[in-house]
């Protein structure tokens, strides 16, 4: 039986023929709907931004933190195009990239160990499982400590552990670009209400962040462990954000809060990942974590009407939730 959803309307049931495959997946609780556009001809002509808004809605849609589109470039390389719940396109998504890496790996799409996003190449590979039965993938993310995405300091300089006076007179932020812009601040304790207020405030400061920004607070729990919470540009507070966890781990390494070159556990409200920052002539941080496929299904989207059905429940989510519970008890 297929579910038919009109945007802003209640669920209705119809028996219809689905047009393309969808996969519900997540990385560390950061959940997505994924569409392989390279083989799903039924998706041709669908407006990706409108589809992302409809699908991501947790009341009238499937519910997700965005949509991952698997695409193929003319030179044969495959890429991830990620759209936020508000329909905007993100340059990069670390949790989403791991999910795409898994699908690409299983379907033989990965060329020279590379996937693309936002015009950049990212090395990806299957990694040692973080727990039994949990598919785990790694992506190496180059880090820039200067970027035109930040208008409050000269792009040739670094902004690490400094107060942005015109934004918040207390928190010491580090500004990093991972293909998408991030500001992160170390705190004694992550306060979600404070994070929400900061996230709402930062959306109004295009004078400081012309392209918007992802904002994170992180707390150092030991030399090898931090906890991160993020207000994502285009999504709000999520259970986790892969590039934000990477940015936080990188900032902590650059500031000497954690040791560069060592494996750091990065916990979040959705679970945990691992990061390792390499600092040399350039800065790269390796992000490792789960790529969980919750279910496979079929869908169509025409005239603003989303229809979908689940065809296979994988059972992987049960394994992830058991792992998540174990983390909570540590």
Give the role of each language-model region:
Residues 10-133, 183-330:
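A glycine-rich beta-to-alpha transition motif near the start of alpha/beta enzyme domains, typified by
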Residues 123-127, 133-137, 152, 156, ...:
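Feature of Fe-S/electron-transfer and energy-metabolism proteins
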Residues 125, 140, 163-165, 276:
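Generic structural detector for well-ordered beta-strands
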Residues 136-138, 142-144:
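Membrane helix-loop-helix hairpins that form the core translocation module of multi-pass transporters
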Residues 146-148, 152-171:
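Active-site glycine-rich loop that binds ribose-phosphate moieties when present
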Residues 162-192:
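Internal active-site segments that recognize and position negatively charged phosphoryl groups
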């Amino acid at each position: 039986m297929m579910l038919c959803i009109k945007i802003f309307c209640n669920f209705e049931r119809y028996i219809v023929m689905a047009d393309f495959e969808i996969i519900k997946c997540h990385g560390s609780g950061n959940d997505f709907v994924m569409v392989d556009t390279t083989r799903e001809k039924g998706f041709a002509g669908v407006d990706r931004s409108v589809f992302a808004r409809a699908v991501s809605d947790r009341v009238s849609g499937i519910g997700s933190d965005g949509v991952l589109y698997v695409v193929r470039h003319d030179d044969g390389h495959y890429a991830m195009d990620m759209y936020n719940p508000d329909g905007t396109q993100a340059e990069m998504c670390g949790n989403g990239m791991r999910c795409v890496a898994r699908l690409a790996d299983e379907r033989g799409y990965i060329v020279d160990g590379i996937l693309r996003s936002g015009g950049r190449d990212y090395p990806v590979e299957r990694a040692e499982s973080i727990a039994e039965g949990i598919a785990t993938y790694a992506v190496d993310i180059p880090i820039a400590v200067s970027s035109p995405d930040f208008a409050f300091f000269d792009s040739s300089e670094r902004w690490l552990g400094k107060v942005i006076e015109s934004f918040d007179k207390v928190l010491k932020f580090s500004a990093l670009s991972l293909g998408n812009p991030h500001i992160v601040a170390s705190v004694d304790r992550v306060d979600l209400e404070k994070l929400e207020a900061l996230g709402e405030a930062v959306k109004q400061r295009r004078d400081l962040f012309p392209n918007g920004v992802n904002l994170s607070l992180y707390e150092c729990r030991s030399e090898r462990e931090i906890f991160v919470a993020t207000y994502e540009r285009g999504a709000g507070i999520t259970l986790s954000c892969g590039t934000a966890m990477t940015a936080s781990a990188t900032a902590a390494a650059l500031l000497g809060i954690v040791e560069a070159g060592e494996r750091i556990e990065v916990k979040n409200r959705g679970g945990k990942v691992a990061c390792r920052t390499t600092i040399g002539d350039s800065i790269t941080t390796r992000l490792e974590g789960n790529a969980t496929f919750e279910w496979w299904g079929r869908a169509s989207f025409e005239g603003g009407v989303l229809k979908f059905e689940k065809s296979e429940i994988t059972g992987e989510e049960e394994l992830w939730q058991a792992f998540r519970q174990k983390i909570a008890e540590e």
